[in-house]
Amino acid sequence: GITDSGVDEFIEDTMNGGHQINDRSLVTVMAEESSDAVDWLDSIGAPLPKVAATGGTTHKYLHEPEDGSAVGSYLVEKLNAQAEKLGVQIMLNTEATEILTENGAAVGIKAKSKEHDYTIHAKSVIIAAGGFGANFDLMASFNPALANAVTTNHAGATGDGILMAEAIGADTVDMDQIQLHPTVYQETGLLVSESVRSMGGILVNAEGKRFCNDLATRDAVSNAELEQPGAYAYIIFDQRIVDDLKSCQKYIKNGLTVSADNYEDLAKAMGLEGDAIQNFVDTMDTWNAAVAAGEDKEFGRSNGMDADLSTAPYYAIKIAPGIHHTMGGLKINTDAEVLDTQGNAIPGLYAAGETTGGVHGGNRIGGNAVCDFVVFGRIAGNNASAYAAN
């Protein structure tokens, strides 16, 4: 969590990252409650002790597991264990299909599995069904260019929670704001963690050259990549980063990387030819000198420069932009209540996480998805519980 003195900077970084179309009231709550959110995760056995800078931030806000594991799967495991500890019933392979209402209030859901149809009555309903980054028809309705893009999202990220709430009058916001992440392995849609760059990794193009501030906002880096020859790049890292990031060890194990003991041989392993090989060697030397000097004169990068790339062996992964996060979704207030098209709260209906819109605006800052869903998930849970009790 961030200290009180860092709250204002966190708010402004998030607003600037989202191109100022975010809902400032939601961003403010997320920032103010972020420290408690991290403490709460720690209290249930899901500590995130490592901190790092991420694209577009002025400070180290990104919280990670100690061993550098991917934070998403790490938290799913920990949160699932906590749910089981509390006796929460989880119905797998069961699809929610409809939100039930009575006198305008949410009073339950309909759901179905292969074997059964269910009607589940409840005193309040929370939608935490994720975004729509795997619903290509829906995304293409806002941006036709995304119809054939690679996505990092799981197959269930189809926006069903948003659509079900819309069917009972819920409003949406920023549905056309869809984020491309710059470091996606195109063959499988696997996201190469932003932490690789936060720890000092860089991006080079097919000519062996850096082409942008590698840790600018995700949209800026993605757009810069798309302008490079072939519209792809390579992410470069060294053994120091591999030793610190468990996710990198998985990339190697799964065959995403090429590697070598020196820069020239890595360039050849990447498939670079001719002048591009020497360009790459020069790029690496220039970058290491920039880290030593504490100044990136080429592109103005100012974070993720705590250590250079000089620990052999060296690694590269060929990457390009891919769909990652849908910033738009259900319109909520700071109590995580879902709003209707007149701006009124729908009684008994709450939402949190990527199902909602307004927090991230036109671009999400790395690390803010976890902050968003923990902060507003807790708010939704507490308020839905209080509503049900009353």
Question: What residue ranges belong to the model's regions?
Answer:
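Internal hydrophobic alpha-helix adjacent to the cofactor/substrate pocket in enzyme cavities
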Residues: 161-171, 273, 277, 281-284, ...
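Conserved N-terminal/central alpha/beta ligand/cofactor-binding core
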Residues: 1-98, 203-215, 229-231, 240-243
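An anion/pyrophosphate-binding glycine-rich loop and adjacent beta-alpha core
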Residues: 162-275
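Helical element adjacent to the flavin cofactor pocket in flavoenzyme catalytic cores
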Residues: 67-123, 162-168, 330-331
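Glycine-rich loop(s) and the adjacent beta-strand/alpha-helix scaffold that form part
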Residues: 113, 120-185, 189, 376-379
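A glycine-rich dinucleotide-binding beta-alpha-beta segment and adjacent secondary-structure elements
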Residues: 98, 278-363
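Short glycine-enriched, charge-decorated loop/helix-capping segments at active-site entrances
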Residues: 64-66, 143-151, 250-254, 363-368
